[in-house]
Amino acid sequence: MSNVENKVIAITGASSGIGEATAKLLAKHGAKVVLGARRTEKLEKIVAEIHSSGGQAEFKAVDVTSRQDVKAFIDFAVEKFGRIDVIYNNAGIMPLSRINDLKIDEWENMINVNIHGVLNGIAAGLPIMEAQGSGQFINTASIAAHAVFPTAAVYCATKYAVWAISEGLRQESNNIRVTTISPGVVETELGSDISQESGKDALKAFRKVSLQPDAIAQAVLYAVSQPDYVDINEVIVRPTASPV
């Protein structure tokens, strides 16, 4: 994976699940990874593990709903390593509920994290990448960007937005690669903030067939490792036995 070695890769939502697995895998292949999330105690442990394995990693607290926070995170990556090659906008939440539960605060929070979080990452990194003449955005969408499920209407809408933003940016870019990663059901902390029983029941049903985070990390590695003239636009990764 020679096209991964020495690349500077910033990852949001890196304190667990897909973000953690991806950071460890990319570092194993020689990338310089910068981990961002709110839970810095978890980030510190992950970075220590990467260092103990001979990898290069840094971390910084970031709230992806804050444009200033995300800019500071990307600027930190550039300060530490001199450039930014890949921004993986991975942070997301999924408080499932039926629409008539009217969990309006949860809707707004989901929109802020899942949509604005991606836009903030793009806003922070795009001018730097354009000045460099190269770069790559990887954005976590979901199979929920391609199908709608009961209790997941708003979540699906946010993930379709991620897909649409990614596709629009791809069409507008000549030398910036854009990749959408659309996971199926993965065994992570996603959904731990569900407050409604209907949403909890739906998640249990979904997770009867699920992947481990490393399966998605492998997809990210594949997208990053391609030659610079090759843009993997979207990778959908489902369990083999997935019914959706």
Identify the meaning behind each predicted range.
Residues R98-I99, E106-E108:
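Substrate-binding pocket helix/loop in short-chain dehydrogenase/reductase
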